[in-house]
Amino acid sequence: SLHDALPICQTSLNLYRVIFVTKLSMMKIVDGGEFDVSKRMVASTKLQEGDEIVDVSVLKEQKDIILQTKDGYFLKFSLEEIPEKKKGAVGVRGMKLTGTDQVENVYYTRPGMADPVIEFKEKQFDLSRIKTGRRDSKGTKPRV
């Protein structure tokens, strides 16, 4: 559940930024200090009708983001392309989706570490095979 998505104390959260990614490919980065509030529960993002959060991560040393859709498209781009927004904002589109396609998985790369290897179409797939593109493009459908 997303209630456990940020197992980090508030003092530490103030030092970091948090990324939100939804199934309709909306995303934003929010300064962790935005969540330093007196209330126990706080709305962390606005969602469009029918949208839901796919990933919430604390950004520490991640470099690139890789989006994978239900229809098998992948898009890799720099986290620097995602603007920092206020917690009440909807965010920006990360990837152009067609039809009923939606973001299913989110992966991150880190400097000096190998890109993740995932199971895709029942085979091992090295995400380093995905070329870096630009935010708000369609992505590619790799052959496995």
Residue ranges and their predicted role:
Residues 1, 5-144:
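C-terminal interaction appendages of subunits in large macromolecular complexes
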